[in-house]
């Protein structure tokens, strides 16, 4: 079942953020603003630090768009802190790192690999009402390109602010949108 258009389910977890150390995060923290939740398999691994560092490179631009980023793995918040303190790539991360050792959040977002107990590579864009608007899931060996998140967020924000309009493929801010109607069926 697709999670697109569904509200984030209740959860409670411990998180780490540079400068704040440990604190609790719940689904309520994802409401009232745009959020991106980035699931990844494991701390102290190979592709994961490259992805998380890539998200960090886009973090300032995402913040300008009113977006908060949360990364999640089935590691504990303690392991996140240790990784942050020991990895040059992960040490640059300013956004929130949620620990999901109970696998609750990974299971709720349907990214838990039940055989390994690890999260798949999943990216979720969530609107201010806590509703999932976009999902991307990648195989274990395929890292994500965080630069595509900026445009996806802008498109999701545009569609939310302009009911009745949709963003076509390769849409960019200021670009032409579509207004679905019978008049354009078969003419695109």
Swiss-Prot record:
Tell me what induces its expression: Induced significantly under aerobic conditions.
Keywords tagged on the record: Antioxidant, Cytoplasm, Disulfide bond, Oxidoreductase, Peroxidase, Redox-active center
| GO MF terms, alphabetically ordered | NADH-dependent peroxiredoxin activity; thioredoxin peroxidase activity
Read off the CDD domains from this record.
PRX_Typ2cys
Q: What is its main location?
A: cytoplasm
- Looking at the record, the residues that make up the Thioredoxin domain are 2-158
Cellular component terms per the entry's GO annotation = cytosol
Which cellular compartments is it found in?
Answer: Cytoplasm
Active-site residues annotated for this sequence: 48
Catalytic activity reported: a hydroperoxide + NADH + H(+) = an alcohol + NAD(+) + H2O
Class of enzymatic activity (EC top level)? oxidoreductase
Q: What is its EC number?
A: 1.11.1.26
What is one Gene Ontology biological process annotated in the Swiss-Prot or TrEMBL record?
A: hydrogen peroxide catabolic process
Q: Which family does it belong to?
A: Belongs to the peroxiredoxin family. AhpC/Prx1 subfamily.
Can you state the subunit structure given in the record? Homodimer; disulfide-linked, upon oxidation. 5 homodimers assemble to form a ring-like decamer.
* Protein function: Thiol-specific peroxidase that catalyzes the reduction of hydrogen peroxide and organic hydroperoxides to water and alcohols, respectively. Plays a role in cell protection against oxidative stress by detoxifying peroxides.
Query: Further notes on this entry?
Result: The active site is a conserved redox-active cysteine residue, the peroxidatic cysteine (C(P)), which makes the nucleophilic attack on the peroxide substrate. The peroxide oxidizes the C(P)-SH to cysteine sulfenic acid (C(P)-SOH), which then reacts with another cysteine residue, the resolving cysteine (C(R)), to form a disulfide bridge. The disulfide is subsequently reduced by an appropriate electron donor to complete the catalytic cycle. In this typical 2-Cys peroxiredoxin, C(R) is provided by the other dimeric subunit to form an intersubunit disulfide.
Please identify the protein, giving its name as recorded: Alkyl hydroperoxide reductase C
Q: Which organism is it from?
A: Amphibacillus xylanus (strain ATCC 51415 / DSM 6626 / JCM 7361 / LMG 17667 / NBRC 15112 / Ep01)
Q: Which gene encodes it?
A: ahpC
